[in-house]
Amino acid sequence: MAGPFSRLLSARPGLRLLALAGAGSLAAGFLLRPEPIRAASERRRQYPPSAEYPDLRKHNNCMASHLTPAVYARLCDKTTPTGWTLDQCIQTGVDNPGHPFIKTVGMVAGDEETYEVFAELFDPVIQERHNGYDPRTMKHTTDLDASKIRSGFFDERYVLSSRVRTGRSIRGLSLPPACTRAERREVERVVVDALSGLKGDLAGRYYRLSEMTEAEQQQLIDDHFLFDKPVSPLLTAAGMARDWPDARGIWHNNEKSFLIWVNEEDHTRVISMEKGGNMKKVFERFCRGLKEVERLIQERGWEFMWNERLGYILTCPSNLGTGLRAGVHIKLPLLSKDSRFPKILENLRLQKRGTGGVDTAATGSIFDISNLDRLGKSEVELVQLVIDGVNYLIDCERRLERGQDIRIPPPLPNKH
């Protein structure tokens, strides 16, 4: 399997030039890796795989459900072309047995090849996390035609804000858990250079975390524009907080309605958001902006990681496919206290998070509600699922306000 530089140098002429131009800064990161990897491999050979197998008896994440001693034994000595190992994939899941709100995946990828080299473990995890999607036999579809969306205007007495986000990874550079400092800085350079070409209502500027004051950072976090500081154990155990805040930042347009995070959990997170309940408008801007970002990236000789089985490749298997999370902040004081609320969400394929995101609790009965699936359905299908599902939640809240009963909807048909 080709390594990052061989893939780069076999690509288009413009990509070869960029790869060669960046070789001086990147070579150290690639060439200095093998020695510690070989040393670790030599130490490992002193012990059988059974002696290295992690204790997962109290774990309930997806990785722990599928990693058997036999699978571990077959995969533990394999590495990707950049030296990423199985133990590095699973460390975050070993260190974090479970989560109070959602069942986490418990593993990450270090590069694009991770999903192939360790497919024996990743494929069943992907199948569990993505509602039965089988990456060995199925193909993912992409659809960024926002004109297909029906309705998409929520009652703003309940929906406070609407947001659509995705992630994209730059092909040929390691993902955040594995990247060197040089690679991370190269991601920032490539992305920021491309974003400088955005025009019209998408035009904006880039802000490096290292150049912000603590107060400026916190204000952006409190306003839900910026990713939080890397305090989540899921991030730190995966190695994604290394060298913080080097080469991290946020780009946003002048209205702060179109944003790109750089080098947090993924190379990029592309976000369209605004206050209120106009999800259709948010998705239209998302599709238009994302297409333009990809065009600008390709114009400079780079491309996003993608394949027809897994869609867009990202760090966490939960974000494969579309990488899309369409969500609202919604106030549900009565429904949230109803014992049927979790089952309603489950049957609608929706996910509940706290007001501030994945590691927070709800305040004032305000929840972050979004699609559970990412892979096997297109962007249009997932946004429509959220629109229909959120409208159902609002209808339930209204019925409870009137003292009427609500019902659990039948499970959505599983169509991949």
Curated annotation (Swiss-Prot):
The keyword Nucleotide-binding applies. It catalyses: creatine + ATP = N-phosphocreatine + ADP + H(+). Residues 158-400 form the Phosphagen kinase C-terminal domain. Pfam families: ATP-gua_Ptrans, ATP-gua_PtransN. Its EC number is 2.7.3.2. ATP binds at residues 161-165, 224, 269, 325, 353-358, 368. Mitochondrial creatine kinase binds cardiolipin. Belongs to the ATP:guanido phosphotransferase family. GO terms for molecular function: ATP binding; creatine kinase activity. This is Creatine kinase U-type, mitochondrial. GO terms for cellular component: mitochondrial inner membrane; mitochondrion. It is a peripheral membrane protein. It is found in: Mitochondrion inner membrane. The gene is CKMT1. Keywords: ATP-binding, Kinase, Membrane, Mitochondrion, Mitochondrion inner membrane, Nucleotide-binding, Phosphoprotein, Transferase, Transit peptide. GO terms for biological process: phosphocreatine biosynthetic process. Reversibly catalyzes the transfer of phosphate between ATP and various phosphogens (e.g. creatine phosphate). Creatine kinase isoenzymes play a central role in energy transduction in tissues with large, fluctuating energy demands, such as skeletal muscle, heart, brain and spermatozoa. Residues 44-131 form the Phosphagen kinase N-terminal domain. Exists as an octamer composed of four MTCK homodimers. PROSITE patterns: PHOSPHAGEN_KINASE, PHOSPHAGEN_KINASE_C, PHOSPHAGEN_KINASE_N. It comes from Sus scrofa (Pig). The keyword Transmembrane does not apply.
